[in-house]
Protein backbone atom coordinates (compact mmCIF):
# COMPACT_ATOMS: atom_id res chain seq x y z
CA UNK A 1 0.00 0.00 0.00
CA UNK A 2 2.85 2.38 0.83
CA UNK A 3 4.43 1.64 -2.54
CA UNK A 4 1.22 2.52 -4.36
CA UNK A 5 0.86 5.76 -2.42
CA UNK A 6 4.47 6.71 -3.08
CA UNK A 7 4.03 5.96 -6.78
CA UNK A 8 0.91 8.14 -6.96
CA UNK A 9 2.69 11.01 -5.22
CA UNK A 10 5.65 10.79 -7.62
CA UNK A 11 3.40 10.70 -10.70
CA UNK A 12 1.46 13.71 -9.40
CA UNK A 13 4.64 15.71 -8.82
CA UNK A 14 5.98 14.89 -12.28
CA UNK A 15 2.70 15.86 -13.97
CA UNK A 16 2.23 19.19 -12.19
CA UNK A 17 3.04 22.41 -13.96
CA UNK A 18 5.14 24.18 -11.37
CA UNK A 19 4.53 27.59 -12.96
CA UNK A 20 7.98 28.28 -14.34
CA UNK A 21 8.29 31.81 -15.69
CA UNK A 22 11.02 33.22 -17.88
CA UNK A 23 13.18 36.18 -16.79
CA UNK A 24 14.54 38.56 -19.44
CA UNK A 25 16.49 41.79 -19.55
CA UNK A 26 14.21 44.76 -20.18
CA UNK A 27 14.75 47.80 -22.38
CA UNK A 28 16.46 50.35 -20.14
CA UNK A 29 18.02 48.37 -17.32
CA UNK A 30 17.24 45.56 -14.97
CA UNK A 31 15.17 42.47 -15.56
CA UNK A 32 11.53 41.55 -15.93
CA UNK A 33 9.66 38.35 -15.08
CA UNK A 34 7.67 37.41 -18.17
CA UNK A 35 3.99 36.54 -18.12
CA UNK A 36 3.33 32.78 -18.32
CA UNK A 37 2.40 32.92 -22.03
CA UNK A 38 5.54 34.92 -22.94
CA UNK A 39 8.17 32.28 -23.71
CA UNK A 40 10.70 34.32 -25.70
CA UNK A 41 13.31 36.88 -24.65
CA UNK A 42 14.24 39.28 -27.44
CA UNK A 43 16.75 42.00 -28.26
CA UNK A 44 16.45 44.17 -31.35
CA UNK A 45 17.83 47.40 -32.73
CA UNK A 46 15.46 50.22 -33.57
CA UNK A 47 17.06 52.74 -35.95
CA UNK A 48 16.96 56.35 -34.79
CA UNK A 49 16.82 59.45 -36.97
CA UNK A 50 20.33 60.70 -36.13
CA UNK A 51 22.23 57.45 -36.60
CA UNK A 52 22.10 56.12 -33.05
CA UNK A 53 20.12 52.91 -32.71
CA UNK A 54 17.97 52.12 -29.69
CA UNK A 55 18.28 48.64 -28.19
CA UNK A 56 14.89 47.22 -27.25
CA UNK A 57 14.75 44.19 -24.92
CA UNK A 58 11.95 42.30 -23.26
CA UNK A 59 9.54 39.35 -23.26
CA UNK A 60 7.32 38.23 -26.11
CA UNK A 61 5.09 35.43 -27.32
CA UNK A 62 6.99 35.31 -30.63
CA UNK A 63 10.18 36.70 -32.12
CA UNK A 64 9.45 40.33 -33.07
CA UNK A 65 10.36 41.88 -36.38
CA UNK A 66 12.76 44.74 -36.72
CA UNK A 67 16.40 45.26 -37.45
CA UNK A 68 18.54 42.26 -36.45
CA UNK A 69 16.29 40.65 -33.83
CA UNK A 70 17.86 38.14 -31.45
CA UNK A 71 15.44 35.73 -29.80
CA UNK A 72 16.08 33.06 -27.18
CA UNK A 73 14.19 31.11 -24.54
CA UNK A 74 16.36 30.79 -21.44
CA UNK A 75 16.65 33.13 -18.46
CA UNK A 76 18.56 36.36 -19.12
CA UNK A 77 19.67 35.26 -22.58
CA UNK A 78 18.93 38.61 -24.29
CA UNK A 79 21.87 40.63 -22.93
Curated annotation (Swiss-Prot):
Q: Give the signal sequence positions.
A: 1-21
Alphabetized UniProt keyword annotations = Acetylcholine receptor inhibiting toxin, Disulfide bond, Ion channel impairing toxin, Neurotoxin, Postsynaptic neurotoxin, Secreted, Signal, Toxin
**Xref: Pfam families:** Toxin_cobra-type (PF21947)
Question: What tissue expression does the UniProt record report for this protein?
Answer: Expressed by the venom gland.
Q: Name one GO molecular function term.
A: ion channel regulator activity
Please give the start and end residues of each transmembrane region: none
Q: Please list the disulfide bridges.
A: 24-41, 34-59, 63-71, 72-77
Q: Which GO terms describe its cellular component?
A: extracellular region
Q: Where is it chiefly localized?
A: secreted
Q: List where in the cell it is found.
A: Secreted
Keyword Disulfide bond on this protein? yes
Q: Which family does it belong to?
A: Belongs to the three-finger toxin family. Short-chain subfamily. Type III alpha-neurotoxin sub-subfamily.
Task performed by this protein: Binds with high affinity to muscle nicotinic acetylcholine receptor (nAChR) and hinders acetylcholine binding to the receptor, thereby impairing neuromuscular transmission. Competes with the binding of alpha-bungarotoxin on muscle AChR (from Torpedo) with an IC(50) of 0.18 uM. Causes muscle paralysis, spasms and increased respiration.
Protein's name according to its UniProt entry: Short neurotoxin 6
Amino acid sequence: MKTLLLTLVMVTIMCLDLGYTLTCYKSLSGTVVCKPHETICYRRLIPATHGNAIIDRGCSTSCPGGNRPVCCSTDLCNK
